[in-house]
């Protein structure tokens, strides 16, 4: 319910519609009351098995931390409402779950799943940073610092160059280097750790994550792209373009670094990744890493959101046009029903493009797709304003 509630939050912010606000409150209230249901053995097993990632139910994208992030946004949006306190208390309860109940003790500090992936421990830390910055708690900041020290222990010098954080697991024969599981996401977290602590170690290791990404980047006809996977038969051959394992997520890392570190390499990296995506024919043409999927996680909704973010930075018509072209594809792939509702049939799994589903969630379905269409609507109306979560480094408003 959290992702759908977040969509209704956005509808409320844009339209001021009381019916949408009530739906958002209902979803948020349910999430506040039932977030622990994600920890029930049968529910945790279902979530982990569905995504094929053990421990994902604890993380920040498809687990408990994601519920906490949405509750924080609910407390902000409904700050003048009596419900805001309920959402705040629930978000802080999730914070205590991470600090007091589920944390394990490593050699240098606390951790949870043992995976540095943003989908796992990295995302949990992003949630805790957001919680600290929203409500303030010096004790929580000290906990984050200790967890950051443990996180640094998971870095590994790569023979390819730079530093690697392999969220796929140390025992696996392959490496996912992009945003949700790899060094791009780890570098992003480290940049935030530097931002809130001022500890230069985090900035230095983040730079070395970028060195690793540069070392494994594959030149295209124009620009470069980071492979979906390192190791295995399809190494260096599949390039996702979406948020999870591809360009739309990975370029968030250099975007954030560009706000903290005055080095031209960050803008260059952003442009190279965008060039690489267009060199593969995106957004209109499918490729090995852009199959018949349009969702926020893997497809056109996530790409449009990212390019709208880039447009907010410099106002380039190029970014706006790319996002609009993605929006055209979202509208063209929409299925309308007799009752006036709409859904999007697409293939969630790249390796099973024939298996279509009509999911409703934010990362994996209609809520995220419709949110992106809402952004494009505001862009056309010339009143674009999009408050950002912590995994979203772009300005809230376009540069004027």
Residue map of PLM features:
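Glycan-recognition and catalytic cores of secretory/periplasmic carbohydrate-active enzymes
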Residues: 1-400
């Amino acid at each position: 319910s959290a992702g759908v509630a977040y969509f209704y939050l956005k509808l409320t912010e844009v339209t001021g519609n009381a019916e949408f606000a009530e739906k958002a409150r209902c979803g948020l209230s349910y999430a506040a009351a039932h977030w622990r249901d994600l920890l029930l053995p049968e529910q945790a097993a279902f979530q982990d098995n569905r995504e094929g990632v053990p421990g994902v139910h604890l993380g920040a994208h498809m687990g408990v931390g994601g519920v906490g992030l949405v509750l924080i946004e609910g407390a902000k949006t409904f700050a003048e409402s009596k419900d805001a306190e309920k959402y705040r208390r629930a978000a802080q309860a999730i914070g205590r779950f991470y600090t007091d109940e589920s944390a394990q003790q490593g050699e240098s500090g606390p951790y949870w799943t043992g995976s540095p992936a943003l989908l796992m421990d990295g995302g949990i830390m992003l949630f805790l940073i957001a919680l600290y910055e929203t409500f303030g708690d010096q004790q929580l900041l000290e906990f984050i610092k200790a967890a950051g020290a443990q996180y640094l222990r998971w870095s590994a010098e790569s023979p390819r160059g730079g530093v690697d954080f392999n969220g796929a697991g140390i025992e696996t024969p392959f490496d996912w280097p992009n945003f949700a599981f790899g060094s791009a996401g780890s570098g992003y977290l480290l940049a935030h750790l530097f931002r809130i602590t001022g500890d230069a170690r985090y900035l230095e290791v983040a730079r070395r994550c970028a060195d690793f990404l540069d070392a494994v980047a594959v030149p295209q006809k124009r620009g470069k792209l980071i492979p979906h996977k390192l190791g295995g038969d399809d190494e260096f051959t599949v390039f996702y373009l979406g948020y999870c394992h591809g360009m739309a997520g990975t370029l968030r890392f250099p975007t954030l670094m560009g706000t903290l570190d005055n080095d031209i390499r960050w803008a260059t990296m952003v442009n190279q990744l965008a060039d690489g995506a267009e060199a593969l024919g995106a957004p209109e043409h499918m490729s090995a890493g852009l199959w018949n999927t349009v969702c926020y996680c893997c497809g056109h909704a996530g790409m449009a959101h990212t390019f709208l973010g880039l447009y907010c930075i410099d106002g380039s018509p190029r970014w706006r046009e790319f996002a609009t072209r993605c929006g055209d594809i979202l509208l063209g792939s929409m299925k309308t029903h007799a009752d006036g509702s709409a859904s999007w049939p697409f293939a969630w799994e790249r390796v099973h493009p024939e298996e279509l589903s009509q999911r409703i969630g934010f990362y994996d379905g209609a809520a995220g797709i419709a949110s992106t269409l809402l952004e494009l609507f505001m862009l056309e109306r010339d009143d674009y304003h999009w408050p950002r979560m912590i995994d979203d480094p772009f300005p809230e408003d376009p540069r004027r």
